[in-house]
């Protein structure tokens, strides 16, 4: 069916056939909003994307209203099993979303973030310290994967012996679960990984209730607001989705962000002369990389978009975030990587409004700590070079690298 849509030149078919979301987004610049023959709307317009993301009239949980949408969005069935995608805060709207966000907020306070910052700094130092001078490494395997993995496992209190298995579940859920449409085999893999992950976290949660520790599960198990608490299902779904979203997207921010730096050597030289630019690097990398390439929302009522497009209740819109983050109406010379871009933080890489990613600050500090440590220990950036061909990961929703061999030069 998707092949037919592609043959017809339908924007949804073109989306599914595209391997480059930035190039695809450029084909959408002819107007703010395009409509597929399936009824699905598609946009790469920054203003439309931002307005949809912040509006309470749009729901995060999609609806399959016809055979075309069912093929693309997937069928949604209620189950006794815990679904990390449909039961976490990311899929909640309105009062339900506000309630859960209020309850999990104690897990993301300034004090907690400061502790996480110290952990990220310590882990980044340990990882960079393991790299030998004048050696070649796979940046993904040596740095981009281990840092967020260690951080999330530490935050959740996952024992060292279980971390590889734990992460494999998260990667399966992120790579397959965030891409649609899926094959029958992919759905089976997804269900297996989801069951194993949620069962494992349920076991950890039961342990934390018996013996609380200084970790996220213990905090979530004991939060209370006006007599309200989180259910076990909500805690398990929240922790599961933190792994899915917090691990894979951060890996890709780190790896693809470093790839972008290597492709923009003038910017790399600037940052080695002024490490105060590292926070700017994080924001511009988020804008250019857009780890989550696109997302979708479903209208909760009949409404009108910023460009005047009329939308019926239940209609779905695909928001091409990779395109919104390069909208020339917002960002001057949007395809250029500029460390000193003044409005880089306007990006929508972490969403916008009520559904702005609650773990955004964690991803930012992980990236900042790793890049700072690399610049300190390997200051000769002239020696930073590709040592082989980067291998890009298949999949459209999440942009990332499977491997990236690099040479970092002499170690200080």
Protein language model features and the residues they cover:
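Cytochrome P450
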Residues: 1-412
